[in-house]
């Protein structure tokens, strides 16, 4: 018997990208997030289906190189940055963009000799507290980048929201305000919003937005589905039933007897 199969609807992907574009200003660009094998949907297939996106975002160098080897020529941003100085010549040779947020990354950029400069995004920690340059360290970090011969000037800025899916939480508004304050004196491009921010925090659209799960037809909001937002599910999982059981009322099922027949 054939096992479970996952079917990918390319038209749904393209529809969802159109929904994204309908919610942002015409001059805001779209970075399609295809990390983690495009959320399990197939990295190369999804990237090529979303060919009208302005750029792609991945988490690891290996993902970026797979895209390049498949013929993808549009900008690719490594959201977590690089983790070894040895990666820098590879980034430069493949025209990859990278987040920078640690002292080690900054030192590597300052000390390497690269064949051509790379485009970087300064990841600012505005409240997520997972990755990023702390606000009080931002100007000093940027001053060193401004002198760095290995990066394209001007450099760009990126941050990530911690509570954008909670519309009554003031944290997102505070993050937007802090990000704007930290970057107001710099000329680079800016990116704040992922799926929840795109849908509900319109003052965070800036120069680039980063749709992730909404591209695949899912809602970032509790109690909502993608259909509620006009999105279409991209993946359908199909399999065969191996049995149909008829249970009596109050009979438990499975380990721990957690579920009881009504």
Walk through the language-model features, giving the residues of each.
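A charged N-terminal "starter" segment
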Residues: 1-97, 103, 116, 152-153
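Unusually extended, aromatic-enriched hydrophobic runs near protein termini
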Residues: 13, 17, 31, 122, ...
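Short, intrinsically disordered, charge-balanced linker/junction segments flanking boundaries
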Residues: 255-262
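Active-site loop/helix belt of alpha/beta enzymes
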Residues: 36-48, 94, 106-119, 126-251
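Generic serine detector
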Residues: 10, 22, 51-52, 69-70, ...
């Amino acid at each position: 018997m054939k096992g479970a199969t996952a079917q990918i609807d390319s038209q749904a992907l393209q529809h969802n990208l159109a929904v994204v574009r309908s919610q942002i200003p015409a001059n805001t660009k779209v970075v399609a997030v295809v990390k983690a094998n495009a959320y399990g949907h197939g990295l190369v297939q999804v990237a090529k289906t979303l060919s009208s996106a302005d750029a792609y975002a991945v988490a690891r160098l290996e993902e970026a190189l797979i895209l390049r080897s498949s013929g993808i020529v549009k900008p690719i941003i490594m959201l977590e940055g690089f983790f070894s100085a040895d990666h820098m010549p590879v980034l430069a040779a493949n025209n990859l963009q990278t987040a920078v947020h640690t002292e080690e990354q900054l030192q590597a950029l300052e000390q390497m000799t690269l064949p051509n400069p790379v485009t970087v995004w300064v990841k600012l920690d505005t409240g997520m507290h997972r990755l990023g340059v702390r606000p009080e360290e931002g100007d000093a970090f940027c001053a060193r980048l401004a002198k760095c011969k290995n990066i394209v000037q001007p450099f760009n800025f990126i941050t990530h929201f911690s509570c954008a899916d909670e519309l009554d939480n003031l944290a997102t508004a505070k993050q937007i305000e802090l990000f704007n304050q930290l970057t107001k004196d710099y000329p680079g491009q800016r990116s704040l919003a992922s799926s929840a921010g795109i849908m509900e925090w319109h003052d965070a659209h800036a120069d680039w937005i980063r749709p992730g799960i909404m591209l695949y037809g899912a809602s970032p909001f509790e109690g909502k589905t993608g259909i509620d937002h006009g999105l279409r599910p991209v993946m359908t999982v199909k399999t065969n039933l191996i049995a149909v059981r008829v249970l009596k009322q109050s009979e438990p099922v499975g380990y721990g007897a957690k579920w009881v027949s009504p």
